[in-house]
């Protein structure tokens, strides 16, 4: 395993909101008010050989870990989204992206399962990333942030789980880039889980280095880019907002907002508002670091290492990972000796279907999770 920790890891807690008291009521099926915590470890060795002197991983948890440490589920998130996947961070805050799937009595049942939702290494929601302070300079890593891989992201999560006392996972589950992580878990730590739920995703990245160059070229259109050293020059929010608008439209946001905003101009204004909010948080260099990791990702070549059962889920209207790729992926899983099932979400919400149309695939997920629990 490509990590080295010369000093004892530290688990820190950063509360974003007070937790519900033991006697406080919450909506049926909800995990209630949640908080982000932070795990910190030292001297984390990356697959490429570089060492992060200090690494932080932000995460949320839902449910309670069993004494034997074997009732856990790991949730993995998408490329530009966060680890907030269930409950709310404040009473009036937004629900987590998989709130319809995670909670008491839901498909991923927190009455029985301990769920860990990890912000991936390199992301902009609390984990170590290019915007983090480089101990050597006291300034953000920026473009000097070392290349990371899906193996590094998974091994960082494994270090987190070890610190929490998790001995075995019932399943790993996640959408999009989270599906990449799910497949990578299956080949990097094949004995550590009983189920893999890869959603609107694939076992191999696409686009190649040309996709990385294209991304950098887009970011460089902002006059503050400065080769990626924009932190003291006002940032690159303008170009990030424009890019986010385009991304949201690829994800199917027009269809999502059509009922609430039937007027096209009002809908466009809402999309831009959401894009502007995102661009105040997400770092351009994180986009580059994660894009590099994604185009180099390839769990397909190591599929024969997988031991867990796979549930592969796509969305009927997804333009990023269309259902047309399913036969090839399923054939390769079968050829590698992997037991796998396929499910297609009949949704108009494209790449966002797994959360927005949770009810349309929750029964299938619940059945799969019940089987994985029995195997655990």
Task: List the predicted regions and their residue ranges.
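Short beta-strand/loop motif that positions the catalytic acidic residue
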Residues: 306, 312-314
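Conserved alpha/beta-hydrolase "acid-adjacent" motif
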Residues: 319-325
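Conserved hydrolase catalytic core segment
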Residues: 168-207
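Conserved acidic catalytic loop of the alpha/beta-hydrolase fold
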Residues: 139-144, 151-170
């Amino acid at each position: 395993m490509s990590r080295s920790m010369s000093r004892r890891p530290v688990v820190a807690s950063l509360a974003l909101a007070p937790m519900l008291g033991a006697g406080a009521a919450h909506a049926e099926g909800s995990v209630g008010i949640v908080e982000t915590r932070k795990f910190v470890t030292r001297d984390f060795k990356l697959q490429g050989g570089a060492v992060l002197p200090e690494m932080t991983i932000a995460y949320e948890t839902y449910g309670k870990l069993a004494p034997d440490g074997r009732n856990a589920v790991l949730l993995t998130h998408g490329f530009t989204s966060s680890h907030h996947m269930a409950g709310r961070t404040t009473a009036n805050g937004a629900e987590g992206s998989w709130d319809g799937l995670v909670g008491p009595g839901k498909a991923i049942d927190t009455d029985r399962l301990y769920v860990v939702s990890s912000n991936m290494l390199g992301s902009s929601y609390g984990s170590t990333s290019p915007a983090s302070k480089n101990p050597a300079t006291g300034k953000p890593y920026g473009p000097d942030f070392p290349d990371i891989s899906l193996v590094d992201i998974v091994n960082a999560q494994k270090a987190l789980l070890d610190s929490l006392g998790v001995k075995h996972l019932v399943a790993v589950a996640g959408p999009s880039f989270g599906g990449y992580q799910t497949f990578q878990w299956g080949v990097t730590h094949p004995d550590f889980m009983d189920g893999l739920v890869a959603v609107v995703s694939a076992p191999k990245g696409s686009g190649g280095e040309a996709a990385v160059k294209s991304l950098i070229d887009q970011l460089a259109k902002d006059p503050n880019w400065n080769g990626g050293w924009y932190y003291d020059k006002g940032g690159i929010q303008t170009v990030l907002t424009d890019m986010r608008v385009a991304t949201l439209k690829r994800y199917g946001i027009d269809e999502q907002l059509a009922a609430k905003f039937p007027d096209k101009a009002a809908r466009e204004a809402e999309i831009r508002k959401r894009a502007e909010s995102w661009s105040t948080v997400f770092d351009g260099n994180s986009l580059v670091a994660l894009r590099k990791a994604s185009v180099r990702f390839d769990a397909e070549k190591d599929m024969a290492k997988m031991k867990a059962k796979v549930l592969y889920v796509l969305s009927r209207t997804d333009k990023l990972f269309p259902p047309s790729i399913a036969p090839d992926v399923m054939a390769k899983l079968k050829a590698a000796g992997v037991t796998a099932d396929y499910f297609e979400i009949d949704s108009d919400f494209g790449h966002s279907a797994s959360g927005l149309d949770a009810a349309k695939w929750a029964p299938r997920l619940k059945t799969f999770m019940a089987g994985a629990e029995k195997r655990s």
